[in-house]
């Protein structure tokens, strides 16, 4: 059951990240105008944040059911501290993108804590497999996002340009995954 739920989390996370990456800027450009677009680097980091959050959602559910909250409490505390410290360091260098990078790093620390609890208590011996699957998922995510973005970049702008982009986002990630 765990591996099926983990796969579902990945499929949903990769779809959400790819959809944001391909649709966010064109939608905002059509709605608010090009002048109000965020930097593409911000959109990419935002997509990674969504991916990290959704990808380990089921792992988090398993971890919550297991209890043993004391085992990963320091990961949570570390996550908050790292987020705060990195935000102060990265914001002056990268503006709002820097603060979001700090959040992605913090979410990865929380993810690591959940991995530790679940694979110590529930899935003993499966950690290497989980890490290999996550590495493969990350490569596949890059291909999905990059491939979909390359196709969408050839689409016309404006409101009508969103229609073929939506079709690309609905098809390409699902075919590649």
What are these regions (language model features)?
Residues 8-17, 76-79, 97-118, 170-174:
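Short alpha-helical transmembrane segments in multi-pass integral membrane proteins
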Residues 78-82, 93, 129-177:
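Transmembrane alpha-helical segments of multi-pass transport proteins
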Residues 17-25, 30, 42-45, 84, ...:
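Membrane-embedded alpha-helical segments of multi-pass transporters/permeases
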Residues 59-67, 115-132:
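Alpha-helical transmembrane segments
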Residues 71-73, 99-100, 130:
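Alpha-helical transmembrane segments and their helix-entry boundary regions
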Residues 68, 94-99:
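A helix-boundary/kink motif common to multi-pass secondary transporters
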Residues 1-77:
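Specific pore-lining/lateral-gate transmembrane helices of multi-pass inner-membrane transport
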């Amino acid at each position: 059951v765990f591996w099926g739920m983990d796969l579902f989390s990945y499929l949903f996370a990769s779809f959400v990240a790819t959809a944001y990456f391909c649709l966010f800027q064109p939608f905002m450009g059509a709605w608010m105008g090009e002048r109000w677009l965020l930097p593409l680097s911000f959109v990419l980091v935002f997509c990674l944040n969504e991916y990290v959050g959704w990808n380990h959602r089921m792992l988090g559910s398993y971890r919550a059911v297991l209890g043993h909250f004391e085992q990963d409490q320091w990961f949570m505390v570390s996550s908050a501290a790292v987020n705060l410290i990195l935000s102060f360091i990265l914001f002056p260098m990268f503006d709002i993108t820097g603060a979001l990078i700090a959040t992605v790093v913090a979410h990865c620390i929380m993810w690591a804590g959940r991995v530790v609890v679940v694979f110590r208590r529930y899935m003993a011996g499966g950690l290497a497999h989980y890490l290999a699957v996550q590495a493969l998922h990350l490569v596949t995510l890059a291909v999905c996002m990059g491939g979909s973005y390359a196709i969408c970049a050839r689409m016309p702008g404006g409101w009508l340009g969103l229609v073929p982009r939506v079709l690309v986002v609905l098809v390409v990630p699902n075919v590649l995954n």
